[in-house]
Amino acid sequence: MWGHRPKAGEWLIRRSMLDEAAAAVMKCVRIVRKYDVPYVGSCNRKGTKVYIDYELPTVLVHRGKRYEIDRYIVMHEVVEMLFEHQLKFSYRDAHQLALRAERALVQSDGLPWTVYNRFCERWIKRIGSRKSYPNPPPDIDLKPEIDEDDKATLRRMGAKRAAKSGRDSMR
C-alpha cells in the first residue's frame, strides 16, 4: 500500500490543490506569446519558458464567465516536459499524462471539458493549417515533432536539419 490510510474524500482531486499546482507551474516558467508555435504550446529546451502561439486568445468566455487559458496550457506543457525529459517517457505518453492534468484543472475551474476541448480543436486546426511558421521560437523544444516524425512541420518551421537528422535544434 502507500503507507497511509486515505481519509474520506482524499481520493478526489481538490480544487485548492489544483490551484496550488497551477500557481506553482506558472511561477516556474516565463510565458512567451510572440512566436509561431505549430503545436499551439511548447517549451524551450531548458524548460524555463512556455511558448504559446501569438494568435491564440488568452481568454475563453463561457456562459458569461472568463477563463484565463494560459494556466491550462502551462500546466500541460510543464507536466509534459517533466515526463518526457526528466522521466524519459515517450512524447505520446507524456502528452497523454499532460492532458489528464490539464483536464483536471479545466474542470476544477468549472469549465466543461467539452467546451474547452472544442475551443482547442478550433485553434489547433487554425494554427496547424498555416503553410509556414516564419517566426518560431529560437530555442523551442523540437522533441515532440521529432518523436512524432513530423518532418513537414519541422520544414514549415525552417528546421530543415532537424527534419533530416532528428537533432533538436532550429539551426
Language model segments and positions:
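Metalloprotease/metallohydrolase-associated module, dominated by Zn2+-dependent proteases
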Residues: 2-69, 85-171
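Active-site recognition of the HExxH zinc-binding catalytic motif
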Residues: 72-84
